[in-house]
C-alpha cells in the first residue's frame, strides 16, 4: 500500500511540496487568488507484491492523508481472496490501519514510528503492532526491515513510479 501525488497541471510541485524546496514562483508574479502549485491529486494504490498487479486504487484530493485510505483499499479486494501481508510505510502506523489489516487476517509490515510507544493490547492489530515495535527495538530499524521483509517494498515503489509516469501524461 502506498500513495503518490499526480500533478494536474505543471511539474515539480508535488516533489517540492513533499521533499522541500521552492514550491511556487515568486509572489510578485502571482495573482492573489490563483494557487496553481496546489493543483494535484493523490493516488493511493494496493499492489500485489508477487505479480505487481494493481489490486486497489483510490484517487483523492491532496488534503486526504494516507492512513485513512488503507481500510478502503483493503475493502476493494474481495474477502474470499487471502491477503498474506500488507506492507506500508510509517505513515500507516495507526490503530485503524493495524485493525483493518488484522481484520483481513493479514500480517502488517509497517515500521513503527521512531517515537512509538506500545499500545494497550486490546485488539489483534495492537498486539501485532506491539510485536513489531518490540522486534524493531531489539534488532534495530535496519535489521528489522530486512528481517520483516519490508525491503521488498521497493518492488511496489517501482510499480508506483510506472503509474506516476503514466498519470502525468494523461
Model-derived regions, located:
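Short amphipathic alpha-helical "interface-anchor" segments enriched in bulky aromatics
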Residues: 126-170
